[in-house]
Regions:
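Sec-dependent bacterial lipoprotein signal peptides
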Residues: 1-14
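Acidic, polar-rich low-complexity tracts and alpha-helical solenoid repeat scaffolds
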Residues: 2, 16-260
């Protein structure tokens, strides 16, 4: 069973010292440890977290990092890495929203840290992973797209930005496919005017998408069904100019038949 958050593990960690906790003050042992931990104790917790990361023991990673983050002194350089690792642990366990929060802390609390661009990339990745089926509500996909674009603006030229651009291209393909599926739905209902709206928006917004040529062909079919001869002629001219080798072009737009 995937745990809902690392805080449950943190509560268990606070009670692992061997003594019985006070019945009405469960958080207190953790707070006292955070206030009295020596540098050596903090280093030990960090070492435990590091080993857990290497072994892929994500529950242990969260447990040790939650404690370490409480005990780190202000300005400790390990804080950003701790949030990154906790984000990866939460992501691995399927807790995408918690992962996004941890990655966001790493990118926003220490924006000049070398890990900040990668952290922002992972924020977007966590949201993108929640939008796995294009036909579903695209809210998470839109959040992912906005975050990838934020990365391009904040950290242009970085390796993370280059990877973000690739992910943007993939998301745009998925958005285009979503529009295409909606258009086909209206085509099946013979609601051609509605289908045309989706197809035109797809072609205008995602002209380089893989489904754009087929969307244009479907647009011609809808125009022809409705008797929009000028639109057929104009769209066929566009198809021949930019997608002349796409499958189905010859059948959809035979030369000399645009106005038939």
């Amino acid at each position: 069973m995937i745990p809902r958050s690392g805080w449950v593990l943190l509560a268990g960690l606070g009670a692992c010292g061997g003594s019985t906790p006070a019945p009405h003050a469960a958080p207190t042992p953790v707070s006292r440890v955070a206030e009295t931990a020596s540098a050596a104790e903090v280093d030990k917790v960090w070492e435990q977290a590091t080993k857990a990361v290497r072994r892929g023991k994500w529950g242990d990673v969260i447990k040790h990092l939650d404690r370490a983050l409480l005990e780190f002194p202000p300005g400790d350089p390990r804080v950003t890495q701790a949030h990154m690792w906790e984000g990866e642990a939460q992501f691995a366990l399927g807790n995408n929203l918690q992962a996004a929060r941890e990655f966001r802390k790493a990118s926003d609390d220490t924006p000049n840290d070398p890990l900040a661009p990668e952290a922002l990339l992972r924020v977007a990745d966590a949201y993108a992973d929640l939008w796995r089926r294009p036909e579903l509500d695209p809210s998470y996909g839109q959040t992912a797209l906005a975050t990838y674009q934020e990365l391009l603006n904040r950290y242009p030229g970085t390796t993370a930005a280059k990877r973000a651009q690739m992910r943007i291209d993939d998301l745009q393909e998925r958005f285009a496919y979503k529009e295409y599926k909606a258009a086909l739905y209206y085509m099946r209902l013979k609601a051609y005017d509605s289908a045309i709206l989706y197809l035109k928006d797809l072609v205008a917004t995602y002209p380089r998408s893989a489904v754009a040529p087929d969307a244009l062909i479907r647009l011609v079919q809808a125009y022809r069904t409705l008797g929009y001869k000028e639109d057929v002629q104009e769209t066929c001219g566009y198809i021949r100019r930019f997608h002349s080798t796409a499958p189905g072009v010859g059948k959809a737009c035979p030369k000399g038949a645009e106005t038939s």
